[in-house]
Amino acid sequence: DLITNSYTRGKPRHVTSWRNLKTRDVCDSLVEGRCIHNGCYCDRSAPHGNCCHTDGCTVAFWCPGTKWD
């Protein structure tokens, strides 16, 4: 059951919410309001919500940087 984003005409069709990410244990840890997962940290207030999924980042520009937990 992967969390994925599908794009149509450049717009995200589905984005998993922060609450759902935490519920599904996708985030390895939280550091200062950021999700740390597979070397990617994503701000909670990112434009379309959190960008972490089971493979790390869904869209690079949603992530301010990377950090291994």
Swiss-Prot record:
Disulfide linkage: none
Any GO molecular function: toxin activity
Primary localisation category: secreted
PTM text: Contains 4 disulfide bonds.
Subcellular location: Secreted
Residues cleaved off as propeptide: 1-23
Top-level taxon in the UniProt lineage: Eukaryota
Free-text tissue specificity from the UniProt record: Expressed by the venom duct.
A GO CC annotation given for this chain: extracellular region
Keywords in alphabetical order: Disulfide bond, Neurotoxin, Secreted, Toxin
Keyword DNA repair on entry: no
Domain remarks: The cysteine framework is XII (C-C-C-C-CC-C-C).
Protein name as catalogued: Conotoxin Cal12.1p5
